[in-house]
Structure formats: C-alpha cells, structure tokens
Amino acid sequence: FVVRMINLADLERVLKGVTGRPRVVCAGSGATPLPLLDAVDRCLETWRFACVNAPVGVPTRKGVIHQTVFIGPGSRHAENLEYVPCRLSLAPRLYEDRFAPDILLLHTSTPHNGAVSMGIEVQVLPAALESAKRRGALVIAQVNPSMPYVFGDGIVDVDDIDIGVIVDT
C-alpha cells in the first residue's frame, strides 16, 4: 500500500491546515465515512458538504452547508441546505464545477493488487474522483477491512489516494 497511512489524530492535524471554506464530497447511504466527516467537522469552522442521500449522523450544525441533489435523512435537519434540482443521471456532471471537491472522502476496501474498491456504495463518486484529480484536491480514504472489494466503476488506483486512514466499522 503506497498511500500515506495515518491515524485519525494525525488526520486532524492535516485538516487543521486547510483554509477557506472547502467543499467536502463523500458517498451517502450505507458507505458514508462518518469517522472522517467527524474529523473534518472538528477541524473546520465552516465547510460545504456535497453528498447524495446523506444518512443520519452527518454534521448538521450551522457552519456546515449541505449541498445535494437528493435530500437524505441526514440533510433534512441541516441548518444550512442548498438543494439543486437535478435528475440523478445528470448529477455526475455537477462534480465538474458546481460540486467540485476540495476534499474527497472515500470509504474503501483494503488494497488488492494496487487498487481499492469503493465497495457497496459508488453513486457519483467516480465523477467526483476524476474532478478531484484534475483539480489537485485532497483525496482521503477510510480504509475499512470490513468493506468488500467489489469490481466495477468503484475501483480506485491507490496512486489516486493521498491519505489513508484505517477504520474498521
């Protein structure tokens, strides 16, 4: 695994160096990397959160601006919510500009042959990853030994990940 592996405390030190009001993008539904989101929320006063179908448990305080095309249960009580009406089939295009990530959080399997899998929830993340690579965004993977390695569009080369954090959930 050639990715820089750190623990959650070290991740918080990295995140405290982030300036401005970054947009953090991650998967929703069953693969939301909640420990990573909690670390982001502890370190950043104000940030934008782009997630399709955010589950209960994501940060919803005033300094977190939810941006989504599908209001999941985690966004319904957010103090700041920007809903963008869009067909889900067109949602990946939003990651080229309007939802372009400054920080991309992935929830992945452990590596196999130089790649990880986004496992059970891929959604629009391949488009977000391509945008992150083009923009030089920070890509952080929550590497979870319990996440299955699933083939398909959710395969990610480990070279595309800047930081890995092992979290077994």
Model regions: which residues?
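Conserved alpha/beta enzyme-core scaffold
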Residues: V2-T169
